[in-house]
Amino acid sequence: MGLPWYRVHTVVLNDPGRLIAVHLMHTALVAGWAGSMALYELAIFDPSDAVLNPMWRQGMFVLPFMARLGVTQSWGGWSITGETAVDPGYWSFEGVAIAHIVLSGLLFLAAVWHWVYWDLELFTDPRTGEPALDLPKMFGIHLFLSGLLCFGFGAFHLSGLWGPGMWVSDPYGLTGHVQPVAPAWGPEGFNPFNPGGIVAHHIAAGVVGIVAGLFHLTVRPPERLYKALRMGNIETVLSSSLAAVFFAAFVVAGTMWYGNAATPVELFGPTRYQWDQGYFRQEIARRVDTAVASGASLEEAWSSIPEKLAFYDYVGNSPAKGGLFRTGQMNKGDGIAQGWLGHAVFKDKNGDVLDVRRLPNFFENFPIVLTDSKGAVRADIPFRRAEAKFSFEETGITASFYGGSLNGQTITDPAQVKKYARKAQLGEAFEFDTETLNSDGVFRTSPRGWFTFGHASFALLFFFGHIWHGSRTLFRDVFAGIEADLGEQIEFGAFQKLGDPTTRKTAA
């Protein structure tokens, strides 16, 4: 059959056995990719520094998804939370990866079997002897099973009743760990940052799915609805499946880009809005103010700030930095973080404290501008030296460090002060190793950015697929040129007036 490449799926029309075979093969490919990708990531992952070199800085994609479901330890004796000499048993990163590869092999064999033995009696309508599928019944079966899975995931895995729970953390991504989570049934369950809502909604959605599945298994659709929605056509199944998938893809693109309950900061990196809104900066300032109010010096207050929290307050960790087509992990851009230099406080020769205006997300270059408490510009490093109105040399800018490796030091050399002002524009100042990975200094996005872009793109593609196949199945008669109310084949010359049966010609 001379089919063009874009029509090859026609071969599984009216062939339920091979329709199952291609779905089994697709699932085999997905499971095989997941397992293989996990082993590849484990081969290149460096677990030595969970604070400054976490998995999201190293470009890990499948490991964070395993970790958020409770798999955090390796047969290599390490854990992503920093512990060593751990014994995870079977459910380690490697164990889960191997399980996926074994599953992929079994699914491959099942696909081959169903491709060879396609003509099963199971798929034959006993009344007609033709291959047929009871699609409404299959819809009920799938709905029931997916509801059961959804309910079980929430009621057992996430709740800890029979499973590890899920990854939870504080609002600033410092204390992340896996623990059982109780469902939140009240209004607090609708807080998008509350993990208890995830558990409750899986249980509730699972119950709805189970009930709806049983309903569709026991109640047949009305004939008018069956015909109106083309429930007997396999392309209707394709269209509605595409709708479900594109809707889910849009939802997860949104939760990945905006939220961090299901996509924790420790595993996927910060969101861009946390940089835009100075989220971590405000928390650091609050902690410092609280410590100073309790009698601590500035050096002591800043030294108490966790390095992990300071590292989040750095623009290079924002997923909005770095273009979509810059390949590679974040560490290939600015380098591997080595340590926090400390918080730089800039002052002019009059002793006024100045603030470095921070780099906005969507700028690659930005002039260094230092403003006073009223927002007036007091010093700058413009793009062109000839345009400098408030040079560091003239205004006598100094940089004093609190916390970090430079704690207590004051820098007065203008060249060095400019260096640290450039770092301060990017958030908290860190030292980076750019040699190990030959980092090029151009920011990369995090797996949070890749996931969002990929799912938003495919959601749009699948949306058009839904419209296309939905139109084909609803208006199949129109596209085929056969109208529903056409009673007989019209032949030119059959009527004196074309199409008017009252003027039918009679044989002479």
Swiss-Prot record:
Transmembrane segments: 21-36, 101-115, 140-156, 203-218, 237-252, 457-472
Domain of life of the organism encoding this protein: Bacteria
Disulfide bond positions: none
Any Pfam family the entry gives: PSII
Subcellular location(s) per record: Cellular thylakoid membrane
Role of this protein: One of the components of the core complex of photosystem II (PSII). It binds chlorophyll and helps catalyze the primary light-induced photochemical processes of PSII. PSII is a light-driven water:plastoquinone oxidoreductase, using light energy to abstract electrons from H(2)O, generating O(2) and a proton gradient subsequently used for ATP formation.
Family to which this protein belongs: Belongs to the PsbB/PsbC family. PsbB subfamily.
Official protein name in the record: Photosystem II CP47 reaction center protein
Gene transcribed to yield this protein: psbB
